[in-house]
Amino acid sequence: MAPSPAPLLSLSLPELTDWVQTTGQPAYRGKQIHQWLYQKGARSLTAMTDLPKVWREKNVHYPIGRSVIDHCAVAPDHTRKYLLRLADGLIIETVGIPSSKRLTVCVSSQVGCAMDCNFCATGKGGFIRNLESHEIVDQVLTVQEEFHERVSNVVFMGMGEPLLNLPQVVKAVECLNQVVGIGQRALTISTVGLPGKIRQLADRHLQVTFAVSLHAPNQTLRQSLIPSARHYPLEQLLADCRAYVETTGRRVTFEYVLLAGVNDQPVHAEELAQKLRGFQTHVNLIPYNPISEVDYQRPTEAQINQFAQVLSDHRIAVSVRYSRGVQADAACGQLRASRKEELAELTPMA
């Protein structure tokens, strides 16, 4: 019996066609399987009823590459936070965020995260491994199937640092664009910034939306919040972002989590405005969602509005992004962290 080289979801249409022929089936069966995987939500060969029954039974053991929903938490705003169990038993987080005109999926790119941002729940659990591209695509398919609605937008803002898994993230982006049919500009890759990685992404000439988690207007404050930033001076990060704009023609979005009394004062806004002067950019202000592991607090509405107004006065495009699904522990890492004792039995220790 011919072995499957990889989970079927990880294979391109040409690869599926080649594989199915090694099992004695005609080439057109590859297209049928491809349609079952991406259009009909099949999770086993048994479900692919227009394929020969004897062949399906003979090859039923071949892996498809779909995760299993371990848990789902639903917030009053209808945001759904999923814990998905992978083939090796590890757990990742995925969030489905519905609105009147779109369905957005927040996907993870790694199991855990090595960045250890001290206000983030995911970083508290450490890094375990990179996700394969099909494990990223599976998250989008799962949300699409659960909501019975086409996914319009995907943001790489879940567990993990996407640029530390760049080859698989790019492969997933290409699949989501070319196979699932989501426009590149509706795909957002977010990073805390890593030396050399932003330029590597720029050289791919993707037309995705690119977001950088900035969170501070100066190097000293930034590296106190993001330990990995000590290896990447803020001035170099901003220079690489300018190079990204020049290479791709796409603006950079800066994400800025507002922490009460830490980085949310008018003086911080003024300093940030000076840093971003003349930059083709947009700033997303994100009021902090408190987690049990750390003592940071959310600013008041007045503080949030004051910070935004300072940036606006300097003619910097700014918006305030209120995280969805807070009641469901849906901010990055929170649901998984809230079940860490149970997950400890499932997750191998490094």
Swiss-Prot record:
The active site is at residues 93, 332. Its EC number is 2.1.1.192. Pfam families: Radical_SAM, RlmN_N. Signal peptide: none annotated. Residues 99-327 form the Radical SAM core domain. Its main location: cytoplasm. [4Fe-4S] cluster binds at residues 113, 117, 120. It catalyses: adenosine(2503) in 23S rRNA + 2 reduced [2Fe-2S]-[ferredoxin] + 2 S-adenosyl-L-methionine = 2-methyladenosine(2503) in 23S rRNA + 5'-deoxyadenosine + L-methionine + 2 oxidized [2Fe-2S]-[ferredoxin] + S-adenosyl-L-homocysteine; adenosine(37) in tRNA + 2 reduced [2Fe-2S]-[ferredoxin] + 2 S-adenosyl-L-methionine = 2-methyladenosine(37) in tRNA + 5'-deoxyadenosine + L-methionine + 2 oxidized [2Fe-2S]-[ferredoxin] + S-adenosyl-L-homocysteine. It is found in: Cytoplasm. GO terms for cellular component: cytoplasm. Disulfide bonds join 106-332. S-adenosyl-L-methionine binds at residues 160-161, 190, 213-215, 289. Coiled coil: none annotated. Keywords: 4Fe-4S, Cytoplasm, Disulfide bond, Iron, Iron-sulfur, Metal-binding, Methyltransferase, rRNA processing, S-adenosyl-L-methionine, Transferase, tRNA processing. GO terms for molecular function: 4 iron, 4 sulfur cluster binding; metal ion binding; rRNA (adenine(2503)-C2-)-methyltransferase activity; rRNA binding; tRNA (adenine(37)-C2)-methyltransferase activity; tRNA binding. One of its GO terms (biological process) is tRNA methylation. Binds 1 [4Fe-4S] cluster. The cluster is coordinated with 3 cysteines and an exchangeable S-adenosyl-L-methionine. Belongs to the radical SAM superfamily. RlmN family. Reaction proceeds by a ping-pong mechanism involving intermediate methylation of a conserved cysteine residue. NCBIfam families: rRNA_mod_RlmN (TIGR00048). Specifically methylates position 2 of adenine 2503 in 23S rRNA and position 2 of adenine 37 in tRNAs. This is Probable dual-specificity RNA methyltransferase RlmN.
